[in-house]
Amino acid sequence: MLQCNKKAENGAMSWLDEVKWDAQGLVPVIAQEAATGDVLMFAWMNREALAKTAELGRAVYFSRSRGRLWFKGEESGHVQTVHEIRLDCDNDVVLLKVTQLGHEPGIACHTGRHSCFFSVLKDGAWQAVDPVLKDPESIYK
């Protein structure tokens, strides 16, 4: 379990108050593979998602399109175990150091790839350079 559930004297989680939330109450989050340093994905968290992530040791994001908490892997089984939660120097970006579970190597992207950052700009065009590890249609039934 992560060591960030310390409550202030008034019962509130004071460490959450140090995060600079945007006007919608969200903070951008980067998920990075702890073992390799690979950047897996970018997402958003609200206060509840960040608190749940710290409590569970599992990545919980806020889905802007669904308007609700999104427990990473709830549909795909591709869960992210969180080893460390970091806050950047401006307190407005969160970095999760994770182990991506559910497939070997771990699949973080809904396209069936290890990382959501699979396109590289080459000669003025975006080219997919990382392979699809599993057909998304077989992941999301």
Curated annotation (Swiss-Prot):
- Report if keyword rRNA-binding is assigned: no
Q: Report whether Transcription shows up as a keyword of the record.
A: no
Note the superkingdom of the native organism: Bacteria
**Residues reported in the UniProt entry to bind Zn(2+):** 89, 109, 116
Q: Where does Mg(2+) bind?
A: 88, 90, 92
Q: What reaction gets catalysed by this protein?
A: 1-(5-phospho-beta-D-ribosyl)-5'-AMP + H2O = 1-(5-phospho-beta-D-ribosyl)-5-[(5-phospho-beta-D-ribosylamino)methylideneamino]imidazole-4-carboxamide
GO CC: one term?
Answer: cytoplasm
Gene3D superfamilies recorded: Phosphoribosyl-AMP cyclohydrolase (3.10.20.810)
Enumerate the subcellular locations listed in this protein's record, separating them with semicolons: Cytoplasm
Q: What class of enzyme is it?
A: hydrolase
How is the cofactor bound here?
Binds 1 Mg(2+) ion per subunit.
User: Which UniProt keywords are listed?
Assistant: Amino-acid biosynthesis, Cytoplasm, Histidine biosynthesis, Hydrolase, Magnesium, Metal-binding, Zinc
Query: Pathway of this protein?
Result: Amino-acid biosynthesis; L-histidine biosynthesis; L-histidine from 5-phospho-alpha-D-ribose 1-diphosphate: step 3/9
EC numbers for this chain: 3.5.4.19
Q: Which cofactor does this sequence's record say it needs?
A: Mg(2+); Zn(2+)
Q: Name one GO biological process term.
A: L-histidine biosynthetic process
The record's principal subcellular location, in a coarse class, is cytoplasm
- One Gene Ontology term of the molecular function aspect: magnesium ion binding
Q: How does it assemble?
A: Homodimer.
Cross-referenced PANTHER family:
HISTIDINE BIOSYNTHESIS BIFUNCTIONAL PROTEIN, HISTIDINE BIOSYNTHESIS BIFUNCTIONAL PROTEIN HIS7
Family according to the record:
Belongs to the PRA-CH family.
- Write out the function statement from the record: Catalyzes the hydrolysis of the adenine ring of phosphoribosyl-AMP.
What's the protein name?
Answer: Phosphoribosyl-AMP cyclohydrolase
Which species is the source of this protein?
Paracidovorax citrulli (strain AAC00-1) (Acidovorax citrulli)
